[in-house]
Design a protein with these regions (language model features):
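Plant-biased detector of terminal regions, especially N-terminal secretory signal peptides
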Residues: 20-23, 80-86, 212-213
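Short N-terminal edge-element motif at the start of the domain
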Residues: 32-35, 47-110
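Short beta-strand element of the conserved SAM-dependent methyltransferase core
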Residues: 17, 114-118, 238-243
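Phosphate/adenylate-binding glycine loop and adjacent helical scaffold
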Residues: 43
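Generic marker of residues within folded, mature protein domains
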Residues: 7, 46, 104-106, 213-215
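Intrinsically disordered, flexible peripheral segments
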Residues: 34-38, 47-66, 122-123, 131-245
């Protein structure tokens, strides 16, 4: 009987390890056309199935063909199922601003808004209620030194870090924004100039963290840019498990 129990325990352990191994690896979403190139989302999971990196990859053909004139444009990147089940994130929207945007003299450079949304595409489209656009979360759910900017319908209210270099006399190159709607954090947004993406092959920064999270899950603590093999990766990294408070 003892040998049988040991055999069963061994089989269960091997099955458990195989199950975790099946969850490990890098999983990609579908390709999307971005100007004359491509973009796609992806997630890297560790051996325990926990997220290690969540990102998007843009080809050099896309970066080199972004129009210098014309209107703003946006491309949606669906996340792979493994990303939606292992992180709070639902999809990514890549916004191109050929002339930048307000405030003048700060964010008026050609740049990308990389929205990592924690709500569905339908919820983003329905984010038009003025009261909900203007409703601020409790201070503990945003990082210190983050202050609200004007709300944008079908996005949300953008909170910016007052200690960021571009708000203290330095040129804008990259920054990290928190977005909210109905008093809840609904997106993370690395905002990065085209020039910075083209000129930096390896960049890493920390993501300011709030004291509390409304939804439990794995959240990133770093943002990275990496260029390799004719593509550029924009990566949320350093995921940490947070409890809801």
């Amino acid at each position: 009987m003892k040998k049988v129990l040991i055999l069963v325990a061994t089989v269960n352990l091997l099955f458990s390890c195989k199950k975790n191994d099946d969850n490990a690896g890098t999983f990609s979403g579908p390709d999307a056309t971005i100007q004359q190139g491509k973009g796609k989302s992806w997630i890297k999971l560790g051996a325990n199935g926990a997220p290690e990196q969540l990102g998007l990859t843009i080809t050099d053909e896309a970066l080199n063909s972004m129009p210098a004139n014309g209107d703003e444009s946006e491309v949606k990147l669906p996340l792979p199922a493994m990303a939606k089940s292992s992180t709070p994130f639902d999809h990514i929207e890549v916004g191109w601003n050929p002339h930048g945007h307000e405030p003048a003299g700060i964010y008026d450079k050609p740049h990308f808004d990389f929205h990592f949304y924690m709500v569905s595409e339908g919820e983003v489209a329905a984010a038009t209620n003025t009261a909900k656009l203007n409703a601020n979360p409790a201070a503990d759910y945003l990082p210190q030194n983050y202050v609200p900017g004007p709300p944008v319908p079908q996005m949300g209210k953008h909170f910016i870090d007052v200690t960021s270099p571009e708000l203290n006399g330095q040129p804008f190159s990259q920054t990290f924004i928190y977005g909210t709607y109905d008093a809840k954090v609904t997106f993370f947004e690395p905002m990065i100039t085209l020039a910075f993406l083209k000129s930096n092959s390896n960049f890493e920064r920390t993501i300011p963290q709030p004291a509390k999270f409304k939804k439990a899950g794995y959240y990133p603590t770093k943002m990275r840019i990496a260029k390799h093999d004719g593509v550029t990766d924009i990566v949320l990294d350093g995921f940490v498990l947070r409890q809801a408070i």
